């Protein structure tokens, strides 16, 4: 056995192979060594930039984090008083009979979706509300104008610069490198993803696009990404449309729809997605995007139909499975929802939320042996951010079982994990109310409504207490708020009808 | 005067009052039909007058009274019928036990219902009193005894009157009627039935107080059939022809409706109503009847209830409405100041009047096929015509239920998985229960453990002890690096709480506080207190954040009373 010699790669080839095998850190180390020997080696330089930017790569399509300022100080919205159903801000009227009692809502007053995504926490209401409530405790929502993810990306560059920053942007001749088609893509991605310096990235993309004679769709897309990050949505739309004329790409369609969503034009976004579907039939990205928009508009039937199409195309799409499961659960078929959640479990996801959902489905489908064990599992694996929800659901189950003392305790534990958990506050209030401690119940309801003013239950229950105590004025205000969340609620209307003659008689 | 309220949409023309007339009569004493040689349909009314005075048979043409003739007895019902194909039709007025037949508005014949058997004791007593063998008082005692023995209604009309009359009248009664005592029953209702389609003669159907129904040949006035039923008939509706097949629907005083078919001998009620039936008509092969509970029932000829209308107020009477040109059929229900038209599914029309109504009659008047004669309580009579362009396109659901009630519950279908799971429950019930009990114990154990931890550390925003029920909530205002922290405290304990402190704790590397320890001298029950402090983020560039805790502590307690844990937001960079 003599002739067999192991081929040992060295130098740039080695770095390339390591990069191919996605061993980014090792590839980067090799590049660093090479650059020490020859700092002017452009190929190595580019490869190192590629390694660095790949390590912090974020799918720009899913990056929906918006800060407080972007959410509320938004001058991009075209129609402030949109017709119902054509705006995310006014989905309520077209939400076909969605009953907040049957399908609970989030803090922002939207019905729960199957998955948590930044988009689903779009906030309706005033900025004042957001400033006051959002930051009192642990919420996932970024409150300041800088969102958590961008912050982390920005800090990454500082940590890396142990022996000096790799590329010093201030001293880099941007015009020269940006015009060089050999390295400009790597440079752009490095600046955009790794350094997170959008202004420079925009400069690079602009120069590169010009150098390519405004003929390169790639640079148009990159420019659009920069504009999206900078909040210049009109420019982003223009770039993307021009890019689509040159080449039809999935990414372009998706980015264009995203831009439309940001300016609150869901109908235009839907149109773009369907145009994309014509070019790329049954494409998962398009279908998922459409489904999300429909869900945000309150068209659950449409949304679930689209998610089912997603599942036909890609049967392991977790978002689609979860959304379909949620719909089944709230549609009164928990046993089917359980099957879907079990499928997610089989695909290797095991989060406390998933176990909790399986537990709740089992409970609703009367599979008591699995119900409690799944919930126990969720409880033992839960992280701090879901602890309140887990305890709240344990409380709900204990209410179902009939152990009200334990239920009250578990709501209290939920509140210790998240003092803003308004559902727990309301349910604790109801339990106190049953015990006859009206004042305690009242204070619990009122803190629930102050923490989540869009909540139907809190407003309604507090309204009821006020009604029985004869505080009619307060009651009317609360009931009107409750009706805003659930316009069809019969009892609210009855109470208002009771109050009307009292007002008229004065 | 009697204008309907909304004229524009009305299906009826504006009512026109008849000139100079004042009519008081029940709705049974009204009929339409040609009675003179001009073949024009007239309005015939048997006017009841006042207490037996001024009883008249009146005939109207157009808007004027054409003629009137006196009536000898109080009319109960009136019918217009054809008894001779070659000559003009006649009128039959039921008064007491007799039918008075008028032809060409002149008295023509008097038919009296045959007398039933008189109780022998009764007739003997009367004979005796006429022959002066006994006096009036003895007669009274005999009759009273008879009343207890056989029942009041079984006595002859004259005995009934005698029992209820005062002394002087009794003497007069004996003088006038004592010799010719008869037991012919009073006619309660009258109807007509066509003999056959080829020979359009009418058969008269009359019901009497003696629970009998007679079918009378109107040519020779011979009784064709006698039917005995169990209750007093008060209203008869006839359907079909006598020679081929007919049905008589008889409403009785006992709130039963009987159906009599040709060739059947045994009559059972087809409708047995719990509440009193007030009116009955036939529309479109349906029996429509009303009860005192303000309900209109639509029933099939077999008595099966098809639909029920709930009306807002008392229904005075029903009148059938048939408009053959457009094949419209409905029932007119008369209320106090309005009429409503219903069919078996919908409310079709409502007409309102300014005066209370007495009755309405629908039929052919003059040359107009569909005329409605409306009589008011004050005696005036108005005439309305159904517009030729009117239709029943706008329909309203009667029994309008609120929509929430009309919605059906969406009960999900049973899935196969559900059935499988149920099967599993049946097979493994025992084991499922055991596992469930064990897990429930586990859940409760963990809950207890967590709660114990919570109470011992008092890291809750709502106090867990019942001795010191205090609630805390914290707001953070600002974007950084300077934040304002506002702490709200609310005590719901019975006594005021004294001498406590609010302590604010966090990582000293990250935040600086203006006042880390705030004295809380007094917490009055039910009052909300707020305390404020500024906090500075030392190094926003680090972009780190950590929890800040606000504790309410008391010098004599080892653990804090309540705790608020706040996750601080990322700080903005300072504005320079």
Curated annotation (Swiss-Prot), chain A:
Broad class of the protein's primary localization: other
Q: Where is this region: Disordered?
A: 83-112
Task: List, alphabetically, the SUPFAM superfamilies matched.
Answer: TPR-like
Note whether Transferase occurs among the keywords. Answer: no
Key words of the record: Cell projection, Cilium, Cilium biogenesis/degradation, Cytoplasm, Cytoskeleton, Protein transport, Repeat, TPR repeat, Transport
Query: Which SMART domains does this chain map to?
Result: TPR
Q: Which InterPro entries match?
A: BBS8, TPR-like_helical_dom_sf, TPR_rpt
Q: Name the PANTHER family for this protein.
A: TETRATRICOPEPTIDE REPEAT PROTEIN 8 (PTHR44177:SF1)
Q: What does this protein do?
A: Component of the BBSome complex. The BBSome complex is thought to function as a coat complex required for sorting of specific membrane proteins to the primary cilia. The BBSome complex is required for ciliogenesis but is dispensable for centriolar satellite function. Required for proper BBSome complex assembly and its ciliary localization. Required for cilia biogenesis and both the assembly and movement of intraflagellar transport proteins along the ciliary axoneme.
Name this protein carries in UniProt? Tetratricopeptide repeat protein 8
Q: Which source organism? A: Caenorhabditis elegans
Q: What is the lineage of its organism?
A: Eukaryota, Metazoa, Ecdysozoa, Nematoda, Chromadorea
Swiss-Prot record, chain B:
Give the disruption phenotype, in one or two sentences.
Mutants have normal body morphology, but with reduced body length and width, delayed larval development and decreased roaming movements. Defective cilia structure and function.
Q: List the GO biological process terms.
A: cilium assembly; intraciliary retrograde transport; non-motile cilium assembly; protein localization to cilium; protein transport
| Any one GO cellular component localisation term in the record | ciliary basal body
Cellular localisation: Cell projection, Cilium; Cytoplasm, Cytoskeleton, Cilium basal body; Cytoplasm, Cytoskeleton, Cilium axoneme
A Pfam family found in this protein is GAE_BBS1
Q: Where does tissue-level expression of this protein occur?
A: Expressed in ciliated cells including amphid and both inner and outer labial neurons of the head and in both phasmid neurons PHA and PHB in the tail at larval stages L1 and L2.
Keywords linked to the UniProt accession: Cell projection, Cilium, Cilium biogenesis/degradation, Cytoplasm, Cytoskeleton, Protein transport, Transport
Q: What is the effect of changing residue 207 to D?
A: In ju598; impaired movement of intraflagellar transport proteins along the ciliary axoneme and accumulation of intraflagellar protein-B at the ciliary tip. Accumulation of all BBSome proteins around the ciliary base
- Provide any one GO MF term from the record: smoothened binding
Question: Subunit structure of this entry?
Answer: Part of BBSome complex, that contains at least bbs-1, bbs-2, bbs-4, bbs-5, osm-12, bbs-8/ttc-8 and bbs-9. Interacts with bbs-7 and bbs-9.
Instruction: Give a short account of what the protein does.
Output: Component of the BBSome complex. The BBSome complex is thought to function as a coat complex required for sorting of specific membrane proteins to the primary cilia. The BBSome complex is required for ciliogenesis but is dispensable for centriolar satellite function. Required for proper BBSome complex assembly and its ciliary localization. Required for cilia biogenesis and both the assembly and movement of intraflagellar transport proteins along the ciliary axoneme.
Name of the protein in its database record: BBSome complex member BBS1
Identify the species of origin.
Caenorhabditis elegans
Native organism taxonomy: Eukaryota, Metazoa, Ecdysozoa, Nematoda, Chromadorea
Gene name, per UniProt, is bbs-1
């Amino acid at each position: 056995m003599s002739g067999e010699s192991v081929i040992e790669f060295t130098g740039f080839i080695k770095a390339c192979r390591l990069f191919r095998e996605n061993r980014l850190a090792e590839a980067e180390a090799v590049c660093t060594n090479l650059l020490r020997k020859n700092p002017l080696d452009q190929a190595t330089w580019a490869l190192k930039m590629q390694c660095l930017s790949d390590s912090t790569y974020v799918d720009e399509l899913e990056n929906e984090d918006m800060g407080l300022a972007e959410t509320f100080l938004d001058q991009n919205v075209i129609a402030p008083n949109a017709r119902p159903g054509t705006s995310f801000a006014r989905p309520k009227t077209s939400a076909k009979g969605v009953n907040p009692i049957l399908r609970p809502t989030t803090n922002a007053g939207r019905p729960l979706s199957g998955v948590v995504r930044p988009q689903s926490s779009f906030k309706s209401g005033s900025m004042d509300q957001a400033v006051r409530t959002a930051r009192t405790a642990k919420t996932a929502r970024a409150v300041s104008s800088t969102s958590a993810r961008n912050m982390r990306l920005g800090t990454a560059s500082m940590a890396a610069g142990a022996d000096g920053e790799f590329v010093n942007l201030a001293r880099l001749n941007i015009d020269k490198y940006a015009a060089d088609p050999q390295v400009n893509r790597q440079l752009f991605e490095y600046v955009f993803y790794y350094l997170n310096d959008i202004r420079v990235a925009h400069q690079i993309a602009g120069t590169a696009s010009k150098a390519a004679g405004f003929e390169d769709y790639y640079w148009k897309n990159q420019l659009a990404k920069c504009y999206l990050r900078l909040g210049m949505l009109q420019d982003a739309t223009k770039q993307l449309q021009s890019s689509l004329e040159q080449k039809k790409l999935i990414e372009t369609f998706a980015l264009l729809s995203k831009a439309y969503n940001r300016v609150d034009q869901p109908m235009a976004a839907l149109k773009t997605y369907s145009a994309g579907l014509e070019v790329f039939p049954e494409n998962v990205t398009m279908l998922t995007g459409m489904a999300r928009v429909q869900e945000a508009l309150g068209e659950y039937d449409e949304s679930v139909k689209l998610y089912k199409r997603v599942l036909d195309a890609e049967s392991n799409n977790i978002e689609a499975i979860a959304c379909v499961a949620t719909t089944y659960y709230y549609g009164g078929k928990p046993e089917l929802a359980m099957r879907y959640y079990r499928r997610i479990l089989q695909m290797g996801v095991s989060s406390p939320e998933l176990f909790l959902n399986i537990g709740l489905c089992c409970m609703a489908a009367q599979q008591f042996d699995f119900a409690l064990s799944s919930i126990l599992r969720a409880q033992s694996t839960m992280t701090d951010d879901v602890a309140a929800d887990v305890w709240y659901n344990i409380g709900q189950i204990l209410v179902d079982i009939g152990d009200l003392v334990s239920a009250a305790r578990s709501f209290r534990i939920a509140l210790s994990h998240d003092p803003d958990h308004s559902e727990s506050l309301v349910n604790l209030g109801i339990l106190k109310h049953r015990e006859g401690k009206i004042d305690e119940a009242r204070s619990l309801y009122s803190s629930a409504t102050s923490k989540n003013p869009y909540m139907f239950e809190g407003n309604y229950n507090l309204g009821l207490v006020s009604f029985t105590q004869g505080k009619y004025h307060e009651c009317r205000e609360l009931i009107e708020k409750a009706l805003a969340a659930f316009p069809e609620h019969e009892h609210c209307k009855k109470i208002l009808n009771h109050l009307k003659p009292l007002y008229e008689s004065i | 005067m009697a204008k309907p309220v909304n004229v524009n949409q009305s299906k009826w023309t504006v009512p026109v009052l008849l000139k100079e007339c004042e009519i008081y009569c029940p709705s049974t004493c009204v009929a339409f039909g040609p009675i003179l040689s001009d073949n024009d349909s007239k309005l015939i009314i048997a006017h009841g007058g006042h207490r037996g005075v001024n009883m008249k048979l009146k005939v109207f043409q157009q808007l004027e009274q054409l003629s009137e003739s006196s009536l000898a007895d109080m009319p109960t019902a009136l019918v217009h019928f054809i008894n001779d194909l070659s000559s003009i039709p006649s009128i039959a007025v039921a008064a007491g036990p007799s039918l008075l037949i008028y032809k060409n508005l002149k008295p023509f014949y008097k038919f009296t219902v045959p007398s039933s058997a008189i109780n022998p004791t009764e007739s003997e007593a009367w004979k005796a009193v006429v022959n002066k063998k006994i006096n009036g008082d003895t007669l009274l005692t005999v009759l009273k005894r008879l009343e207890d023995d056989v029942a009041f209604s079984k006595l002859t009309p004259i005995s009934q009157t005698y029992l209820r009359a005062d002394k002087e009248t009794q003497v007069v009664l004996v003088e006038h009627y004592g010799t010719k005592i008869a037991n012919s029953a009073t006619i309660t209702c009258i109807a007509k039935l066509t003999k056959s389609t080829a020979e359009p003669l009418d058969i008269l159907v009359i019901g009497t107080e003696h629970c009998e129904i007679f079918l009378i040949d109107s040519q020779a006035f011979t009784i064709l059939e006698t039917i005995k039923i169990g209750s007093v008939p008060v209203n008869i509706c006839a359907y079909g022809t006598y020679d081929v097949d007919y049905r008589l629907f008889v409403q009785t005083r006992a709130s039963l409706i009987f159906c009599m078919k040709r060739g059947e001998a045994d009559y059972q009620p087809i409708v047995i109503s719990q509440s009193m039936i007030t009116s009955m008509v036939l529309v479109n092969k349906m029996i429509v009847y009303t009860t005192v509970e303000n309900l209109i029932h639509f029933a099939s000829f077999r008595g099966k209830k098809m639909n029920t209308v709930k009306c807002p107020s008392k229904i005075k009477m029903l009148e059938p409405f048939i408009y053959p040109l457009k094949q419209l059929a409905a029932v007119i229900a008369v209320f106090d100041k309005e009429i409503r038209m219903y069919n078996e599914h919908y409310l079709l029309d409502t007409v309102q009047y300014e005066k209370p109504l007495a009755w309405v009659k629908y039929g052919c008047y003059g040359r107009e096929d569909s005329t409605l004669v409306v009589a008011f309580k004050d005696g005036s009579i108005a005439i309305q015509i159904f517009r030729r362009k009117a239709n029943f396109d706008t329909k309203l659901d009667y029994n309008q239920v609120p929509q929430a009630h009309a919605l059906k519950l969406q009960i999900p279908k049973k899935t196969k998985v559900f059935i499988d799971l149920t099967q599993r429950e049946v097979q493994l019930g025992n084991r499922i229960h055991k596992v469930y009990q064990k897990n429930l114990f586990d859940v409760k154990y963990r809950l207890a453990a967590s709660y114990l931890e919570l109470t011992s550390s008092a890291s809750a925003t709502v106090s867990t002890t019942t001795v010191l029920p205090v609630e805390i909530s914290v707001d953070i205002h600002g974007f950084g690096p300077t934040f304002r922290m506002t702490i709200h405290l609310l005590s719901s304990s019975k006594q005021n709480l004294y001498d406590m402190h609010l302590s604010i704790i966090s990582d000293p590397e990250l935040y600086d506080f203006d006042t880390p320890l705030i004295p809380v001298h007094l917490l009055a029950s039910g009052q909300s207190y707020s305390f404020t402090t500024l906090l500075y983020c030392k190094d926003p560039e680090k972009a780190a954040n950590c929890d800040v805790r606000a504790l309410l502590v008391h010098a004599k307690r080892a653990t804090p009373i309540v705790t608020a844990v706040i996750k601080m937001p990322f700080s903005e960079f300072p504005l320079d």
